[in-house]
Structure formats: C-alpha cells, structure tokens
Amino acid sequence: MESNTASDKTDIGFDREDRYTRPEGEVQDPPNSFWSTIKYLGPSVIISATIVGSGEIILTASLGAMVGYTMLWWVLMSCWSKSILQAELARYVVLSGDTYLRAINRVPGKIRGPRGYFSWPIILGLLAFIPGLTGMGGLVGGAAQAVGLVFPEFEPLWVVGCLAVITAILLGSGSYHRLESIMLVFVLTFTVLTVLSLIFMQDTQYATTVEQIASGFTFEFRTEYAVLALAAYGYTGVNSGEISSYTYWCIEKGYPARIGRYDGSEEWRARATGWLKVLRTDVWITMGLLTCATIPFYFLGAGVLHASGQRPEGSEAISALSYMFTETLGPWSLWLFALGAFCILYSSTVAAVAAGGRYIPDYLMELGFLSRDRVDVRKNIIKWYGLIVPFVGLSLYAGFQNPVLMVTIAASVAAIMLPVQSGITIYLQSTRLPAEMLPGRAASSFLKLTFLFHLVMAVLVIYFVVV
C-alpha cells in the first residue's frame, strides 16, 4: 500500500520508473526563449480540438438560443474557472512522473479489489467512463448531421458508420505526433471560421451591441434552463475528462521525461522550473483558443437563434444551428457552417477516442491486472481501443440519435467530477511535491477557491439534473 504521509514530499522520484512517462535518455534542458518554446507546445492543440466540439457548438450556442445574452458571464466563468486546475494537475504529473490514474490512486481511502487495494477515485473514474462514451457518440452523430446539411441524401447513420471507419484508421497507429498534426489542421480551420462568422455577423441586423454585451454581466441565472446551463458549465472550457486527458498529452509530448527523475539537485530544479514555464504557456494557449471558439458561438446563438426563435434540439440540432450562418450571411454560408461544424465535432470525436485509449491500460495497472513496466502492452491497448471504440460510438448514436441529449448527459457527469479532481490536486501537491516546486500563494489560493466553487456546482448538478 502506498504511503501518503507528509514525508512523501521528497519521494516523487523514488517509485519504480514508469517507462511510459519517463523513457530512458530523454532528460533535456528547457528552451530559453519564446521562439524556441513554440516547438515544444502541442498538448493545447489536441485538448482544444476536444473542448470546442461538445461544449461550444452544441451546448453554448443552445444556451444562447434559449436565454439570449444574459448568461454571457456564466459562459466566460465556465471557460476560465477550470484552467487553474488544468495547470496545477499537470504540474503534479510532469514533476512526479505519475500518470493521472496513478496519481488519483495515491489518495487515502482504499478499497479491496480482486488484485489488491485501490483508491476510491478509481471507481468514480470508471463510473464516468460510460457517460463519456455517450458524449462521444453525440459528437460523431453531430458531425454526421453536419455532412447531411450539404448532402441530405446521405443517411446520418451511414455517415456515422463511415466516420467510425475513418476514425479507426486514423487512430490505428496510436501515435501522439500523428494525432497532433491532424488536430492542428482541424483547430486552425474551425477557429478561423468561427471568428470570421462573428465578424460577418456585425454587418447584419443581428449585430451585437454594447447594451447586449452589458446585459450579459447582470449575473442573472435563468433557473428554467438550469440543466442546460449546468451542462454548458460542465463541458465549456476544459471539462474534467479533458483535464485528465491533458496530462496524458503532456506525458506523450515528453515533459516528464525531459525534467527527469527527482534527485534534489539544483540541475533538476532548474529543468523543472523551465519546463513548467513551457507547460504554463501551453495552458494559456488552450484558454485563448477555447475563448476564441466559445464566445462567437454564444453570440451567434444569442444574437440569431434567440432573436428568431430557433431552438437546436433533437435530431435537427445541427440544422437549427446552421441558421446562425444562413440567416446572417445567406444560403451560400451553409457550406461554410457545415465545414466548420464538421471540423469541430469530428476533431472532438477523434481526440476523445484517442484520449480514452490512454486510460484503459492505466486502469488495468492500478487495479492490479497489468504490470506497469509493460509499455509494449500499453501501446497495443491504445491501438486496439482506437480501432474498436469508434464503432461503440456508432452503436450509441444509433440508440439515441439526439446529440444534445447525449452531450448533456456526459457534461453533467463531467461537472460532478470537477471537485473530486481539484480536491485531489490540492492533496497531491501538499503531500508529495517538494516545497520549492509548489505553486505560488496566489495560484494556490485560487485553486482552493476553485475547489469550493466546483463543489457548489456539483451539488447544483445533482439537484437540478439528477434529482
């Protein structure tokens, strides 16, 4: 059983090495300029692809359609309140060499399993996994509906099937670098299209006014739309699933390997400090990208759909959302919206499936079914997951055929998981990191306030959604 006492503060390098997180011979000094830092960024690109597909195009625009501009404050808070957790959980992972599931398995409160003891958050993660698959089915279904806008003769279920095949082919190699390259194209495409759409809207009758923006900061909360608002909170910005998957992308980008095993030396501290700066830059880029994607979709939903009475629901959700473009730019823009929606939703599907494959071998290891030194088995599981799970998404979509409902279910579960993650991050930092590697006072205080806020939000989700 793992020790979790304060004496562990200098033990972050004393576990048996995990060659997944720290391959041999990759210790490297950090870059010393902004331009040299750029080539070491990348996890933000993958996580941004995951973020915008679910919360932004479906839930954020839907919330704007329902309430207008009055909950702009809520959307911004949902975007920005979780980045501190993203940064601080990643801090622990890259310094310790733990994977995400290895980290949460260090929390006190052990449960006896068939192969030994494990911590209670492991069970919560497993319980959240199925709703996450449901959300993935909603994303690929939404991508199929986007294709159907310009090719209405194509049956959506058949399009989902084709996308499942393409996803399996793309992810069959399990390569991080291949995934990063694919996501970069998608992220650049949908970010440019989304920002352009908002700019074009300003030349129409739906142009956003200063008064409308001001109404978004009256801090009004429309309780009749609480379920949708809380779902948007759960999935807008980095949600709990994306926060955890971000740590795996940091591992595969090589941050823990370049920092190296903790030895208490000044050289290690200098490397760790430098690579943490790279990590923070990557987190800031994530927040910038998701803000550029979120606000335009909320404004389009509030300015166009709310004013015209359109409501994106059920199997016609993506078609209703396309009204944001066609009403402001003309019928030709249906192709523009379809391309943007497809890039957003399908990139989220690919990134979500790729992330899911990283959890499975870790679960097997933490539950005692697989040795941690079997990096070869880990890689094979990741590949097979990428080949099989896209067809699970196809099956789930065939059963629901309602992207908004499917994503709302997953988003509600994601919101409930946030206080668990923030509480665990506070615990792990305070008990297992050297004092000189802890966050500053401001960041530490903000993380604790975030934990309390996430706790309140989780209670509201349980009250409005579950009960």
Locate the predicted segments by residue.
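Hydrophobic alpha-helical segments and their helix-loop junctions in multi-pass secondary transporters
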Residues: L188-Y248, Q421-P434, A458-V465
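Flexible loop linkers connecting adjacent transmembrane helices
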Residues: Y20, T60-S62, A87-G116, Q145-G148, ...
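Membrane-water interface regions at transmembrane-helix termini and the short interhelical loops
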Residues: G141-V150, L163-F186, S197-M201, L396-P403, ...
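Extracellular loop-to-transmembrane helix junctions
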Residues: W35, S62-R91, L101-N105, S119-P121
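Extracellular/periplasmic helix-exit of transmembrane alpha-helices
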Residues: I84-L95, C250-I251, A257-R258, G288-S319
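Helix-loop-helix module between adjacent transmembrane segments
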Residues: S48, K82-A90, G113-S175, G234-V238, ...
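Membrane-interface "cap" regions at the ends of multi-pass membrane proteins
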Residues: M1-I58, G116-S119, Y255, I259-G260, ...
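Loop-to-transmembrane helix boundary motifs in multi-pass membrane proteins
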Residues: E153-C162, W332, L364-A398
